[in-house]
Amino acid sequence: MPDYMYLLESRLSPEQRAVLERVQELSRSQDVNIYLSGGAVRDLISGQPIRDLDFTVEGNPVRMVRELEKGGARTLWESEKLRHHEVIFAGDVDGSISGARDDVYEKPGAKPEIRFSGIMEDLRRRDFSINAIAISLNTQSRGLLLDPTNGLADLEKQEVRALTNHAFTNQPIRLMRILRYCARMNFRMESRTQEWFDLAIERELHKNLGGADVGNEVRSLAREDNPVATLKQWESHDMLAAIHPNLPRRKPDYDSLNKLARVRGNLMESGLRPRLNVPVMYYTLGRLKDREASAAMRNMELRASEIKEVDELVGHAQKIVQDLKGRKTNAPKDAYFYLASVLPEMLAFIEVEMPNPKAVSKIRSYLQKWRPLRLGLPVGELDALGVPRGTKFDKIIEELFELQLRGRGRDPESRVKILRNLAGIKEEPKKKPEKEKKRKGKEAGTPEVKHEKSKGETPATTSPAAAAKSAPASEKVASAAAGASATKAKGKSAKAGAAAKRARPAAKPKGRAAKSGRR
């Protein structure tokens, strides 16, 4: 069996891992059982990007949510009736926390009676098997996979399977949702589910869609890598009218949505995570008239703050473009800090909707040059120089960053030199190579003769050899030259004597040999 906790830790971002650890700590301190469930587990197993973390608690999660809010989490929407909380966790992580429940229908299509339950009942009441999987985060069963409807097998077969034949009758919004899953994951409907889907379309259940459910589905488009694929699926099944009756005729702005998806990819490569809810809503409704778009947002029960953001999107973007064109952002430092204060989704919208050359050039410099410089500031190098952390430390880093924006201090050698200057640390003197001592009193090419005085030797008892050693240098040179000449002459004399000896005739024999010869 796969180690799902290891899989989680390796697939989650650092921010998501921090949320996971914090939620587990709170569940232990509050003595409640908690599970990672739904889309996070589905995406984990299928290899899709993990967009959000959905947690299910056996009990009421409100205490846990309040503790998370103290640590920086923000609640976007909550329902006491459903015990459901849509949250942006600390670290800008999307997710939700909900209490385990069961939905009981008296008859198909009726409003369900909500009963709070355990995790297994909660998984069985869900829409599709691929969403009915959970991983235990509890101490004694940590990493245990819960899959009561065999959703893992459907993930392997790349199929979306409804859990009951009344799935679309009970909640017609699932017609839009299943098309979104198929478009996102490139899955097909399981054969019986396809039959139930076709029957629901034949009964025109899709024409009764509306309200907050449709609003939630349109919001979900902003999390899709390719929202156009989902919108075209909805269009082919005559579901765009659920957003507004005139949308099938006018159609969403597909070209701008495709550009927006590409720009989002560039922003994410730069380490930014844009929330495209407002731009995606704007382009989905963009070809409707203003009053039609406003009516559509009201019918989808969008929050007043969301409607205001969509209405003011263009004006806000125009102001940013004017600032980027003006003197306010002429200097690279000023442009950097200005753009760092702008929401990433606004940068994406400007690149798509208002491609002013000067503004776009600064945005791209921010993403591709300035921001990487900022993230790579040499804090460790300044630590190594012995500068203590504090106001002075931060000031030096900021001054270095400003110089780097101007093109200075980008290579290691010059960067260290600048850091030393800014910190007031003198450079270490360079070590000079050792040089040979000059030979005193010696001509070039002559061997050095060292004088070593014998221990205990006095001038009165100096031997001739010692006296010669103590003679002046000029006398030594002359003596050495004379000795060399004498040696050379002696050698020549010896050679001449040997030659003469070879040339001399043999001597006459003496004694009896001589007398006998005379006879």
Task: List each language-model region with its residue ranges.
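Catalytic cores of the polymerase beta-like nucleotidyltransferase superfamily
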Residues: 1-519
